[in-house]
């Protein structure tokens, strides 16, 4: 039986989660409800026509209270307080507003009768932080409010897991060169982060990220060993992780790349990919992998100082993992 999910917040991630489910053709998950404060027809229009991912691959029909993308009508509401949503029949709520990111805030969803909540962001006090493919096997029926981590943590974690298992990571520092996102302005304006107050499409913008430290929530063996920063750049989608780390023993480019290739062709197939071509960021737009390792960018100095590069579609890869994790949670109900 398909896991019944509802999407709270139909923005970039919410729409792409629905699209990922439809495009994949998977039948183990069914979106039965959407809650968003915008008008139904506006949400449908933004689903039909996407500036980054192109036209929706199916006809989108609407009524005053439903959106239908070919699998039957999806109930659409515009309720501000999640506790008031009529979602007693929902297995997993995908919390995609960016507002209700703590376990405490998500109690409102549980109060309305929903069984589980999956947060599309790092979650404060979540029962568990999951990067699908890396630690989803640690999910239990007692994990009620789960964080899907961030797109960057989803990119870094599979690579870090493979390399730590193969050669050991003593410590490392990550820089994510990250496309601008919806919380950045098109022109200079007020923002609590003065770097992000500047026009997104006009500058490379240094800012913070907790993605590297969050790997410790997913891989306890790396807790405290990784840190990082972000540089937001004037592209609308696709980002890349540049990780420099000290290996626990001497290694080579060939050993690092070989470990990644084996994992990508084995237990991490579909999660971790790799490329041996001279690709640039646009080549990874709409790529469903969490992480695509760039083989010819691997460097090793004096045996232990290592540098790797791994790409990710920060919207599409993450949205596909939201669906994967929701199904894993639903199977435990």
How should these model regions be labeled?
Residues 1-197, 324, 332-333:
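N-terminal Rossmann-like NAD(P) cofactor-binding subdomain of oxidoreductases
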Residues 4-6, 145-147, 241-247, 306-312:
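Short glycine-rich or small-residue beta-strand-to-loop segments that form or flank ligand, phosphate
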Residues 12, 16, 20, 108, ...:
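Alpha-helical scaffold segments in soluble metabolic enzymes
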Residues 23-86, 168-171, 176-306:
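C-terminal substrate-binding/catalytic lobe of Rossmann-fold NAD(P)-dependent oxidoreductases
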Residues 40, 124, 212, 315-316:
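Alpha-helix N-cap/helix-start and coil->helix boundary motif
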Residues 97-98, 151, 207, 248, ...:
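Structured loop/turn residues at secondary-structure junctions
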Residues 154, 251, 316-317:
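A generic structural signal for alpha-helix starts
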Residues 285-333:
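NAD(P)-dependent Rossmann-like dehydrogenase/reductase catalytic/cofactor-binding core
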